[in-house]
Regions:
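Substrate-binding/active-site clefts of carbohydrate-active enzymes
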Residues: 94-103, 107-119, 131-148, 154-328, ...
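Conserved alpha/beta catalytic core and glycan-binding cleft of carbohydrate-active enzymes
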Residues: 102, 301-303, 318, 323, ...
Length: 499
């Protein structure tokens, strides 16, 4: 039987809590478990009663204080009921024996060694005596969200070195286009290394593929010094199978989260789900989401989030009826208002962007509540650039939707949409000697579309290299596969003119 004991301090959070320079208190939310031990570098990975965790009187939270630590990194896991070994779901760094071998050590110079021979699987890491990053531009804030010009980028397909330090070197190029915000595709720990990042496993950790946490902080800090906000693409609709939230409560017979999983639905509530669907009406999930968002906004000083698949934050079951999924859902609105209110308790200026694509009556409510809403104008603008009839009003003009607030983040391209120039060159219209399939003509068509696009009031977003007429198909090398990095486009005078 576990020792029943109240938490020693009232302000402890799930995960690692540092107590001075030699101790940590570990907390794990794990209701309905019988016993949990901690194993790690600090006890040579031995299963010992000295490292049995205490259970709080409400029987929901397990905790232990580990003393006698030195100023260094320690790997550890939780051994649950003698059957499940998992990394801390709130870990800020994990070691992966299957994928870390392909992490470039020049990008992540201080990666701790995996405890080979002591354990197996993914392990979590904490570091005692870690030096705080010396922020220089903490006073930065977004002054006017409706004037955002956002540059969406995926580090893997933007720079060959795939690291934050080289990304810093591109800021003059990005800033020269009038960009005042960068939206990073997901950089939280995801499964594998080569990915868009929408397959998250540890939502509090920086994925090691692009560098360590201080390198990310330096990138954000320097962006702020240049007057550029940094927005994080946040994936909280779901988790993938390596997540400890999945593994702690798993139905092996049906290969899905168990019915008593505190965070995840056994079966997703909508047809567009990927991975395993979070139940955002669960108090466990709400607590988790609140801590994750606070971590990224305060520890890394991100300026806001673009929430992936925000329409999925509902327990309304619409499987088999995609149309019903998009209809006005007051329970979903309530979830988003709760998340917003929790953020506003400590950050009044964070920009909250929803990839929602719900019916207009719901998006109008959310816009009025201060959310920015993605507005996909790809089809309409691409029809125009190809030389066909098109109505440009709905995708990019908030007033056409009956909104009072300029909170529509419109875009002609995104990571999810086909590239304008690809379709211009493949399917462009013609009239006599005038053909949109001609490269320079196609570029001129995109230039004309841009002149219209950027004059419509409200925030705007462009996709990386779209300013140079990137013309590789979105499905080149597979939809989420690596794409050619085309800085050489700058050598083409007509492409360079477009930007």
């Amino acid at each position: 039987s576990p020792n029943i004991a109240a938490l020693p301090f009232s302000d402890l959070k799930d995960g690692v809590n540092y107590v001075g320079d030699t101790s940590v208190i570990l907390l794990l939310h794990a209701p309905r478990k019988d016993f949990i031990y901690v194993q790690g570098d600090f006890n040579d990975w031995k299963l010992s009663n000295d490292y049995a965790m205490n259970l709080t009187p409400d029987r929901n939270t397990w905790w232990i204080q580990v003393n006698g630590l030195q100023k260094k990194s320690y790997a550890y896991i939780y051994n649950i009921d003698g059957q499940i070994k998992v990394a801390d779901p709130m870990a800020e760094l994990v070691l992966d024996p299957w994928n870390d071998a392909w992490v470039n050590r020049e990008n992540f110079t201080d990666l701790p060694a995996y405890p080979t021979g002591k354990t197996n699987g993914i392990v979590s890491v904490f570091t005692v005596g870690k030096t705080a990053y010396p922020w220089k531009n903490s006073a930065f804030e977004i002054k006017n969200p409706s004037a955002l010009n956002i540059y969406e980028l995926h580090i893997r397909d933007f720079i060959a070195s795939r690291d934050y330090e080289t990304l810093i070197d591109t800021l003059n190029y990005i800033k020269s286009m009038g960009i005042n915000a960068i939206e990073l595709m997901p950089i939280g720990e995801f499964e594998g290394n080569n990915s868009w990042g929408y397959n998250p496993s540890f939502h509090m950790a920086v994925d090691k593929y692009y560098g360590n946490e201080n390198q990310l902080k330096e990138f954000i800090d320097i962006c702020h010094g240049e007057g550029i906000a940094v927005i994080l693409d946040m994936v909280l609709n779901h988790a993938f199978g390596q997540s400890s939230h999945c593994r702690m409560y798993w139905d092996a017979n049906n290969n899905r989260p168990s019915t008593d999983n505190p965070w995840l639905n056994p079966v997703a509530k909508h047809d567009f789900n990927v991975g395993y669907d979070y139940n955002h009406e669960s108090s466990s999930t709400a607590k988790f989401v609140k801590q994750v968002l606070h971590h990224w906004l305060t520890e890394f000083q991100f300026d806001g989030f673009r929430f992936d698949l925000s329409k999925g934050f509902t327990q309304k079951n619409t499987l088999g009826n995609t149309g019903a999924w998009g209809q006005l859902d007051n329970s979903r609105i309530a979830i988003w208002k709760r998340i917003r209110d929790e953020i506003r308790e400590y950050d009044k200026n964070a920009v909250l962007i929803l990839e929602h694509f719900a019916d207009n009556d719901e998006e109008k409510v959310l816009s009025k509540e201060g959310f920015l809403i993605w507005g996909n104008a790809n089809h309409e603008y691409n029809e125009a650039t190809m030389g066909y009839t098109s109505d440009l009003s709905w995708g990019s003009n908030y007033k056409s939707r009956g909104w009072n607030e300029p909170n529509l983040v419109s875009y002609m391209e995104s990571h999810d949409e086909e590239r304008l120039m690809y379709k211009n060159l493949q399917y462009g219209n013609s009239n006599g000697n005038y053909s949109v399939k001609d490269l320079n003509t196609g570029l001129k068509r995109v230039e004309m579309a841009s002149n219209i696009f950027f004059t419509v009031p409200g925030p705007k977003m462009i996709w990386q290299f779209g300013e140079l007429g990137y013309d590789y198909e979105i499905d080149y090398n597979g939809r989420t596969g690596e794409k050619p990095i085309k800085w050489d486009y700058l050598q083409d005078r007509n492409r360079a003119h477009l930007r």
